[in-house]
Amino acid sequence: MIFQQNRIFNYSLAVNICFYSSNYIKIYIMKLILLIFLILSSFSINAAFSIEVSISEQRLYLYEKNKLIRSYPVSSSAYGEGQVENSLKTPLGMHKIKSKIGTNVDKYHFFVSREHIPQKVDIINEKIDTEDDFITSRIMWLDGLNEGYNKGLNVDSFKRFIYIHGTHEEGLIGEKASHGCIRMLNHDVLELYELIPEETTVNIFL
């Protein structure tokens, strides 16, 4: 009789263990599937957009799923193209947008060390180099993807503070005029900022 009760108890215990183990496994699998879905969704959103910056044309091209949807005039560096820190040159190669800065900041307001200064700058529409380098409206901070070329050591685009940003020298857009960054018209940089997510790739080429 005792032996039979033990068998019943052991069977019941085994059933309960299997039941709880099964539920735990199901919950774990569901969480894993959800995590994979979120990762793939994020990748899909980011991969949908890509940016090409042509130095020779002084234009930025925005693609969605390999289809051109926007084209903007820009200004790259007045000092030419190069990767080395303190050169003031525009780096070439593949980058990604590491950080977007300036959401809800008023148009023509400017930044100092990426901190918003709630004050509008005077926009220069003539082809005049004021020797100032106001960063206005929005910032998209670039991070190099080519190790040893535009990432790491003394050729790191992110540590060089290379941005896509608005400028007060709008009259010089379309010409090489920046100190290394990619400058845009303020209304253009506002639009681009809203269209693309962080992690969007940016290819800068001659």
Where are these regions (language model features)?
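Cationic, low-complexity basic patches in intrinsically disordered or flexible, solvent-exposed regions
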Residues: 5
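Sec-dependent signal peptide recognition
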Residues: 30-36
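Electropositive
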Residues: 69-107
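N-terminal signal peptide c-region/cleavage motif recognized by signal peptidases
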Residues: 42-44
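Extracytoplasmic
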Residues: 48, 55-57, 69, 92, ...
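Exported/periplasmic cell-wall-interacting domains
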Residues: 88, 105-206
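A structural motif detector for short, solvent-exposed N-terminal "entry" segments of globular domains
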Residues: 47-80
